[in-house]
C-alpha cells in the first residue's frame, strides 16, 4: 500500500534561550518517526525544511507548536510520495539567514496576502524584487521581477544602498518575495533602513502564492532545496512550460542535475538527450574525468549524495558554480 507523505516548509523568529536543548529534543523525537529534514535552530528561532510520513508529520507539527515560543509557527504543506532528504539533519546556526549584519526585526515590510500580491502585480506600479539565488531565478520567477546583481546574500546591504540611489525611496514602492518568506523578513527591514517608505513582502513566499492563487503571474517552476530540485507552484497544474535552457544545447528545459564527476559536482540544467551523451556531466571535460559516478536515468535527476544539495542552505555564503554558467 502506497504511503502518503508531507513536505513542510516553515520558519519562526522567536527567542530561544537554549538552542542546543531544542536540537537535542528534535533529534530524539525523530528517532521514532519516519521523517527526513534540514532544520536550523538558533537563539533567533527556527528555519525548517521537512518531509515525513503523513501521521508522523502531523505529530511533529503538533509537537512543535506545544514547545515554548513556537505556538504560532506556520507550516506550508505539499503532498509528496516519499521522503525528500537523505537524512534527518538538525543543526545550530547563529544566523537563520546569513547576512553578516544586525537587522531590526521589529521594523519589517508589510506582509501582504497572495491575493493582495497578485492584485499589486496586476497594477504594475511597484518595483518587484526576487531575493533568491541566481540558480533559483533561472527556472522560475514572477513576471517583471528584478533579480539583484549579487553573488551572496551578504552583499544585500550594499545592494540596498545602491538601490536607494537608483530609485527615490520616498516615491518607489517595493515588493519582494522569496521561496517561503524568511529572507524577506530581513531584507525588507534593510530597505526600510535605507529610507524606502513603502515596502511589501509576500506572506508565505512563492509556496503560499501557488497554494492560494495557482500559477497566476508566476512563470516556470520553483526551485526547492531537496531531492525534487524543482516543482510547479500549483500542485493541481503540473504542465509547466520551461523558461530555462539546457546548458549544453540551449533547448528549452528546467531539469537540474548535479555533475556525475565527483570532483566537480556542479548543479546544471540539462535536457534528456544531452544528459545521456555527457554521462550525466556538466561538460565534455567532466565526462572524461577519472572519477565519474555511475549515472542512470532510472534515478531521475535526484542529486548524488556527496555534497548533497539539501545540505547547501538557501542562505548559503558562496554561490554554486552553476550560477556562473
UniProtKB/Swiss-Prot annotation:
Reply yes or no: does the keyword Glycoprotein apply. no
Q: Where is the Rhodanese domain?
A: 122-218
Q: Which reaction does it catalyse?
A: uridine(34) in tRNA + AH2 + O2 = 5-hydroxyuridine(34) in tRNA + A + H2O
Q: Any idea which GO molecular function terms this record carries?
A: oxidoreductase activity, acting on paired donors, with incorporation or reduction of molecular oxygen
Which biological processes are named by the entry's GO terms? tRNA modification
Q: Which PROSITE patterns match?
A: RHODANESE_3 (PS50206)
SS bond list: none
Q: Which SUPFAM superfamilies match?
A: Rhodanese/Cell cycle control phosphatase
Q: Which residues form the signal peptide?
A: none
Q: Which UniProt keywords apply?
A: Oxidoreductase, tRNA processing
Q: What is its EC number?
A: 1.14.-.-
Q: Which positions are catalytic residues? A: 178
User: Which SMART domains does this UniProt record tie to the protein?
Assistant: RHOD
Report the family membership: Belongs to the TrhO family.
What this chain does, per the entry, is described as:
Catalyzes oxygen-dependent 5-hydroxyuridine (ho5U) modification at position 34 in tRNAs.
Indicate what this protein is called per its UniProt record.
tRNA uridine(34) hydroxylase
